[in-house]
């Protein structure tokens, strides 16, 4: 399954706010479609599926990519759900987004893919790169790169910088000081239901 490229507000109306996908909020509180207001009682499977879709669409992942992250999380000691969120939050595209360099994760991914971002002084154009504590995430020292990010900083995606990050707006340099804590994950999701969804596949 490829990344979602359709209308974003339809997804937000169905799943709730997805801060990584879009800054817009749905005006209507019910899902799209002719029968959107007449929701039947959902099965446990449908609830788990919805939580999985939230996670996948918010971080802009394919089905295969998310399954790989679940498998990686299972191999790490600790709560699989929490480790899964940490792996996704520490991706380079998400870190660029959380630093405020881009208004959404898709926009941050584009910055990374086009070579506008450096890690410890070297250009890294792999959006899935896992950021580690102590690393410096900066805008490439080129006029087009700086102009892009300076424009983005006027309309940040999220107001609050997570406690594990710091960012110098004048130098356009950020630093990863640790691993994100659960309370700083902006997406409202039940990660345990996502792990349960994949329990037979991972």
From Swiss-Prot:
Record keywords: Ribonucleoprotein, Ribosomal protein, RNA-binding, rRNA-binding
GO cellular component: small ribosomal subunit
Signal peptide: none
Stored InterPro entries: Ribosomal_uS4, Ribosomal_uS4_bac-type, Ribosomal_uS4_CS, Ribosomal_uS4_N, S4_RNA-bd, S4_RNA-bd_sf
UniProt entry tagged with the keyword Repeat: no
GO molecular function term, any single one: rRNA binding
Region (Disordered): 22-43
A Pfam family the protein falls into: Ribosomal_S4
SMART domains linked: Ribosomal_S4, S4
Segments forming domain S4 RNA-binding: 90-152
GO BP: ribosomal small subunit biogenesis; translation
Xref: PROSITE patterns: RIBOSOMAL_S4, S4
The keyword RNA-binding belongs to this UniProt entry's keyword annotation: yes
Task performed by this protein: One of the primary rRNA binding proteins, it binds directly to 16S rRNA where it nucleates assembly of the body of the 30S subunit.
Family that this chain belongs to: Belongs to the universal ribosomal protein uS4 family.
Quaternary structure note: Part of the 30S ribosomal subunit. Contacts protein S5. The interaction surface between S4 and S5 is involved in control of translational fidelity.
Protein name, as recorded: Small ribosomal subunit protein uS4
Organism: Trichormus variabilis (strain ATCC 29413 / PCC 7937)
């Amino acid at each position: 399954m490829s990344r979602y490229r359709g209308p974003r507000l339809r997804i937000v109306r169905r799943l709730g706010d997805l801060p990584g996908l879009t800054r817009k909020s749905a005006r209507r509180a019910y899902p799209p479609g002719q029968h959107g207001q007449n929701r039947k009682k959902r099965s446990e499977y449908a609830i788990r599926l919805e939580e999985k879709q939230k996670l996948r669409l918010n971080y802009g992942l394919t089905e295969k990519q998310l399954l790989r992250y679940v498998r990686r999380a299972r191999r790490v000691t600790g709560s699989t759900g929490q480790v899964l969120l940490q792996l996704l939050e520490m991706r380079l595209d998400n870190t660029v987004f959380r630093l405020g360099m881009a208004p959404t994760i898709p926009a941050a991914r584009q910055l990374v893919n086009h070579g506008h971002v450096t890690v410890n002084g070297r250009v890294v154009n792999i959006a899935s790169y896992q950021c580690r504590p102590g690393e410096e995430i900066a805008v490439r020292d080129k006029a087009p790169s700086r102009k892009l990010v300076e424009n983005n900083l006027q309309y940040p995606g999220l107001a609050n910088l997570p406690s594990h990050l710091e960012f110098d707006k004048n130098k356009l340099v950020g630093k990863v000081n640790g691993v994100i804590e659960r309370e700083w994950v902006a997406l409202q999701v039940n990660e345990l239901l996502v792990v349960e969804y994949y329990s037979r596949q991972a």
